[in-house]
Amino acid sequence: MQSMEALMPRDSHLETLQTVLDGLMRRYQARVPDVARVLQAMTAAGLIGHAGAVENDHIAFRTMGVPHLGIASLERIFLHYGYTRHDRYNFATKKLTAYWYRPPQVHFPRIFISELRVPELSPQAQSIITSYTDEVQQDPVDDLDLDDGHAVDAFLHQPLWRTPTWDDYQTLLRESEFAAWVIYNRYYLNHFTVTVHNLPAPYNTIASFNEFLVAHGFTLNDAGGTIKVSADGNLIQSSLVAQMVPATFADGHGGTIEQRIAGSYIEFAERRVLPDFRDLPPDQLGREHRRDGFDAGNADGIFESTYTHQTRKQEV
């Protein structure tokens, strides 16, 4: 006998997924003013007809590798909607592990989830992190109705642990800027990605689109170069420096303190046509004909969009 899961219409999962993605993007755009500015510039230049016409290559989340959380927990949400996991990436210096997830249909974005390998940090950093994450006593996805898109959206934006203190945030920042970002932002969407290769020429390459961004006053992340190219040359990426956002921390004495920290950012991706399909007419090219997946070298630099040595450039 088939399970209720197997009998559930596929469309219901996809509708729920769309609700979740819409919720993520709505809150992300409200917190990242650069999104509206970029989309307005693209619309004014005729690159897209309207803001909703932009093609989202992928979205990304950051997680802590601790019991009940991390990739093993968060991925369950998207696997439920038909995403499939691919390719493990290791970032030795940053102490990160990541996977990417292929969507159930090509109009949905890919997903990239990274996880901090907490046991590799110093005892002090581990102690700070677990003092918060130990408040999570079981996998929170266990109690989540994955068929309720609004509930999933709310979960992805709710606190998983108490508000961190400013002192703890600063201590983590000195050792792992990734850790500091996650201890405050939790599952908040880290970035979304504009698909560049389907834009009108000449703006359909990262090189030309970066020039467009700079001309409109945006600050590019130059960690690893402003243009990041995969080892095979077929995935070209860039990103903006994360904007600084207001954040409320605990002051350690029962009150709160307001600070400005790195928020989320925007990425841009150009996926070149694979050699076997380069004779296809442009109007016949689909996602399946282009370079898929990710590149560890590119991603290593893009992570630093939220790092202090990048964000301080906006203050100059």
Model-identified regions with their sequence ranges:
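Extended, well-ordered protein cores
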Residues: 3-75, 80-316
